[in-house]
Amino acid sequence: ATSSIEGVPNAGFRGTMIVLDEESMAYRERGPLSAVLQLEENPKVVVLYRNPSHDVGWKFRCTAAIHKDGPVFQRIMDQLVEHRLLTNSDGTGTAVLLRVDQILTLYGEVVQERVPNLSW
């Protein structure tokens, strides 16, 4: 979920989300340009993950960075191909890097923070 600078919320499913490294996740944004513009003006993002068959779930509060080309873009696209979430790294779309700031339970209890007592 994202929010514009004016506070207008936006939410959508992302089927190409990957864990990129120990501090970040990433995905390919294929949606309308408005989704990318909203991330550029307000990079605060909440990602919900739930696996009902294992009765687990978390909220990830993240800060997004947009990559339309360059080495970070290519690294994310290559990882998506490696994980079979894309068939090829054809250079289309936008790579979104999400630095994880906080991990919470689905009930809002803080499990882990990048910076203690982070005001988010």
Which ranges hold each PLM region?
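Short, solvent-exposed amphipathic alpha-helical segments in soluble enzyme
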Residues: 16-17, 42-44, 114-115
